[in-house]
From Swiss-Prot:
Protein name stated in the entry: Transcription antitermination protein NusB
Residues making up the signal peptide according to the UniProt record: none
Domain of life: Bacteria
Keywords for this protein: RNA-binding, Transcription, Transcription antitermination, Transcription regulation
Gene name for this UniProt entry: nusB
TM helices/strands, residue ranges: none
InterPro entries per UniProt: NusB-like_sf (IPR035926), NusB_fam (IPR011605), NusB_RsmB_TIM44 (IPR006027)
Pfam family, one: NusB
Described function: Involved in transcription antitermination. Required for transcription of ribosomal RNA (rRNA) genes. Binds specifically to the boxA antiterminator sequence of the ribosomal RNA (rrn) operons.
Origin species: Solibacter usitatus (strain Ellin6076)
One BP term from GO: DNA-templated transcription termination
Gene Ontology molecular function: RNA binding
Family recorded in the similarity comment: Belongs to the NusB family.
GO cellular component, one term: cytosol
């Protein structure tokens, strides 16, 4: 099985295909694996598939969180790679069970690899703002006043 970092790269590439082609997520997953592996058909990494499907399934919530913290940027005006790095990271941070610092670090690595230094700073700022609005992992549950 691929490392988690490689899995996130693959998930990003699939999300990029999905976003660019405006096609069903399963078609994007198939297109990625069929294009990347034309002669052999490796076992699909469940972590990759879960990240992609989860991001798309919760897209409205994910995009809303990004939009609230991406000052002066509309989703459709962001570079596609940055938009999908943010989507992947916000999903993983809020629903995927990965600690926020790990998710942010991994997203910054993706931005360094697939985008530019300005994007690294932008991604860091947005994800840090999303992290700050999340409840602390070990915080006691909020009490309801009766």
């Amino acid at each position: 099985m691929a490392s988690r970092r490689r899995a996130r790269q693959r998930a990003l590439q699939i999300l990029f295909i999905w976003d660019a082609r405006k096609q069903p997520v399963e078609d994007a997953i198939n297109a990625y694996y069929d294009t990347l592996y034309s002669d052999e058909k490796p076992e699909r990494d469940p972590f990759v598939i879960d990240l992609v499907r989860g991001t798309v399934e919760h897209l409205a919530e994910v995009d809303d969180r990004i939009t609230r913290h991406a000052e002066h940027w509309r989703m459709e005006r962001m570079p596609a790679v940055d938009r999908n790095i943010l989507r992947l990271a916000v999903y993983e941070m809020t629903r995927g069970g990965t600690p926020a610092p790990v998710t942010i670090d991994e997203a910054l690595e993706l931005a360094r690899k697939f985008s530019n230094e300005e994007s690294v700073q932008f991604v860091n700022g947005v994800l840090d703002a999303v992290r700050r609005e999340m409840p602390e992992p070990n915080a006691p549950p909020a009490r309801l006043n009766s």
